[in-house]
A protein has these predicted regions:
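WD40-like beta-propeller blades
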Residues: 1-103, 107-155, 169-212
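Residue-level signature for tetratricopeptide repeat
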Residues: 184, 214-222
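Alpha-solenoid helical repeat scaffolds
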Residues: 213-214, 242
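Short helix-adjacent coil turns
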Residues: 188-193, 223-224, 236
Length: 242
């Protein structure tokens, strides 16, 4: 691959054919390393590239994930296969299971024109970076927080998520259990998301029926009796006769 553009990322995708995905500032290209198509020139997959640190691989789907300012995109060797709208500048991306991990740059960098005089790189050390975990399947933000420092590295290992900050700290994140996730959704009255989560996790019918009933109780308290009855009917196996 010959290009005048800076290469911002490299990822291998191994299947029947081993493909190298190459990102530059203005395009995504593929180059077959072994298998059918080996020896052919690199092929442009997308006329939009990404920044350094914004190309990664989903180990579960084997898709290549690209984070841009407008959205997060997934690719296979044939082209784009999915996109998830999430606007804002991105500095780093990584995957944990089927979650997309994103780090956004410090506010002082994204708002550079409005900074007061006398500022310098030292100020950025104390600026906040935003760390976000997206669940594309459920179309929700699973976690978001402001970090008091820039981020040097973002990765997952040993079943956990790690962030290394510019000031030398290592932050570790552990995924909540299924029951803990449900409790959070119940507290926020996100019952439809709770149902979707249960179906995604393929929990048994008894557990799903408990969620239907909780949703029915919530709707009944709100006075939405018809919809509440629909949920009770879905959970009929776990509903005691009145």
């Amino acid at each position: 691959l010959e290009t005048d553009e800076p290469i911002t990322g490299l990822e291998f995708r191994e299947a029947n054919v081993t493909t190298l995905f190459i990102s530059t500032t203005s395009r995504i290209s593929t180059l077959v390393i072994s298998g059918k198509g080996q020896g052919q020139p690199a092929r442009t997959l997308d006329e939009h590239g990404c920044a350094v640190g914004c190309l990664t691989k989903d180990l579960h789907s084997n898709d290549i994930v690209v984070a841009r300012d407008d959205a997060v995109y997934a690719y296979n060797p044939r082209g784009r296969v999915a996109s998830y709208a999430y606007e804002g500048p991105k500095k780093l991306t990584a995957m944990y299971k089927d979650y997309v991990l994103l780090v956004s740059p410090p506010k002082s960098m994204t708002n550079a024109p409005t900074r007061s005089f006398g500022g310098g790189q030292a100020d950025d050390l104390f600026s906040t970076s935003n760390f976000t975990i997206l669940n594309p399947d459920l179309k929700l933000i699973a976690h978001t927080e402001a970090l008091p420092s820039q981020v040097n590295a973002l990765f997952s290992a040993w079943g956990q998520i790690y962030i290394v900050t510019l000031d030398g700290k290592v932050l570790r994140y552990t995924e909540k259990t299924f029951q803990q996730k449900l409790e959070v959704l119940y507290q926020r009255e996100f019952f439809v998301l709770a149902i979707n989560l249960a179906q995604k996790e393929k929990v048994d019918a008894v557990q799903q029926n408990l969620i239907f009933r909780k949703y029915g109780d919530y709707l009944y308290r709100k006075g939405d009796f018809d919809t509440a009855m629909q949920q009770y009917l879905r959970a009929i196996d776990n509903t005691e006769p009145s």
